Amino acid sequence: LKVPDLPLPE
């Protein structure tokens, strides 16, 4: 299953 991309800190 593909998990939604988490907002990574830039």
UniProtKB/Swiss-Prot annotation:
Gene Ontology cellular component terms for the protein in this record: extracellular region
S-S bonds: none
Keyword Membrane belongs to the record: no
One GO MF term: toxin activity
Tissue: Expressed by the venom gland.
Cellular localisation: Secreted
Homology family: Belongs to the scolopendra toxin 8 family.
Protein name stated in the entry: Scolopendra 8013.07 Da toxin
Source organism (scientific name): Scolopendra angulata (Barbados giant red centipede)
